């Protein structure tokens, strides 16, 4: 039974940092439930506003429907009571509905609707896809605007008018004109979150567009640094943001961009670099090379991001 109504969930999520926990795998690439539970317990010990299980960073695209449900269930059970867990819905409409209903059965508070896999969609098709998911669950639904799932402003407005449990718009395109049209049409009926890869890079300018939060992949392995960065963004401390970008985030991007798919792989490389192993990634992704991990370890050390600690009163 969800503790948050859809609107209460939106109000909660928009005022804090969000993250997508990596899904731990064993050497045979089966889900490592023990390591995953430990990871969720560690992540939820920080003042993060919400954790999205089986999302992009959690390799939800590589999980079966059954694994998606189990991973979400484990996250709900392991998370601190103060930190809501949301599920992720992906694939075909039928699969996305199964994911959403599985998340609700697991006790999740909401669901993120990811783009359908490898299919072209027009506006009406995307409306029907999102509408079917909204109708299938009482949980709050957030759509992810990215890749082949570019929701027109008119579709977002229709969804927000028709479905009270449609609560959020996550953008992974960075199209400012598109975002401006949506925020103008929908206003504070929805909450808006940044979903570009390594979202810290864009967080400060997007704050001016009404995006008060974003999904932080690096929270997986340097949560103190990620929360400090978010605090600087919300305070609009441009000097502090630029310093952190220069010291860590931009060099981190250089490592991430060495190979396609490293946006997910580097998170597990980061966990390994800080002594927390969530295993490798499933194909078709590939793991960071040993040199990549060594370079990331050096960057974490020289930038101070790996040893950064929040003041106790902030972390409590």
UniProtKB/Swiss-Prot annotation:
Pathway: Carbohydrate acid metabolism; D-glucarate degradation; 2,5-dioxopentanoate from D-glucarate: step 2/2
InterPro entries associated with the record: Aldolase_TIM, DapA-like, Dehydro-deoxyglucarate_dehyd
EC identifiers of the protein: 4.2.1.41
Keyword Lyase: yes
Pfam families, alphabetized: DHDPS
Domain of life: Bacteria
GO molecular function: 4-hydroxy-tetrahydrodipicolinate synthase activity; 5-dehydro-4-deoxyglucarate dehydratase activity
Chain segments annotated as coiled-coil in the UniProt record: none
Keywords: Lyase
Catalysed reactions, semicolon-separated: 5-dehydro-4-deoxy-D-glucarate + H(+) = 2,5-dioxopentanoate + CO2 + H2O
CDD domains in alphabetical order: KDGDH
Family to which the UniProt record says this protein belongs: Belongs to the DapA family.
Alphabetical list of HAMAP family matching this protein: KDGDH (MF_00694)
PANTHER family linked to this entry: 5-DEHYDRO-4-DEOXYGLUCARATE DEHYDRATASE 2-RELATED (PTHR12128:SF19), DIHYDRODIPICOLINATE SYNTHASE (PTHR12128)
Designated name of the protein: Probable 5-dehydro-4-deoxyglucarate dehydratase
Source organism of the structure: Corynebacterium glutamicum (strain R)
């Amino acid at each position: 039974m969800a503790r948050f109504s859809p609107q209460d969930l939106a109000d909660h999520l928009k005022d804090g940092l969000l993250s997508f926990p990596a899904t731990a795998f064993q050497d045979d690439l089966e889900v490592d439930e023990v390591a995953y539970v430990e990871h969720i317990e560690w992540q939820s010990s920080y003042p993060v506003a919400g954790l999205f299980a089986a999302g992009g960073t959690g390799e939800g695209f590589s999980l079966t429907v059954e694994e998606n449900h189990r991973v979400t269930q484990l996250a709900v059970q392991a998370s601190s009571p103060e930190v809501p867990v949301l599920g992720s819905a992906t694939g075909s409409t039928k699969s996305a509905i199964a994911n959403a209903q599985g998340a609700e059965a697991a006790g999740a508070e909401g669901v993120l609707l990811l783009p359908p896999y490898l299919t072209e969609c027009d506006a009406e098709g995307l409306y029907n896809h999102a509408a079917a998911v909204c109708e299938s669950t009482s949980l709050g639904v957030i759509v992810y605007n990215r890749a082949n799932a570019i929701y027109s402003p008119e579709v977002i407005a229709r969804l927000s008018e028709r479905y009270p449990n449609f609560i959020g718009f996550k953008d992974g395109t960075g199209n400012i004109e598109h975002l401006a049209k949506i925020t103008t049409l929908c206003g504070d009926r929805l909450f808006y979150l940044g979903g570009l890869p390594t979202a810290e890079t864009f967080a400060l300018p997007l704050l001016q567009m009404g995006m008060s939060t974003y999904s932080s992949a690096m929270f997986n392995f340097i949560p103190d640094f990620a929360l400090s960065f978010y605090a600087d963004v919300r305070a609009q401390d441009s000097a502090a943001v630029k310093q952190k970008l220069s010291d860590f985030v931009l060099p981190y991007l250089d490592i991430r961009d060495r190979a396609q798919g490293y946006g997910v792989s580097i998170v597990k490389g980061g966990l390994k670099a800080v002594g927390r192993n969530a295993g490798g990634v499933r194909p078709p992704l590939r793991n960071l090379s040993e040199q990549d991990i060594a370079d990331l370890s050096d960057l974490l050390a020289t930038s101070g991001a790996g040893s950064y600690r929040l003041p106790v009163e902030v972390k409590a």
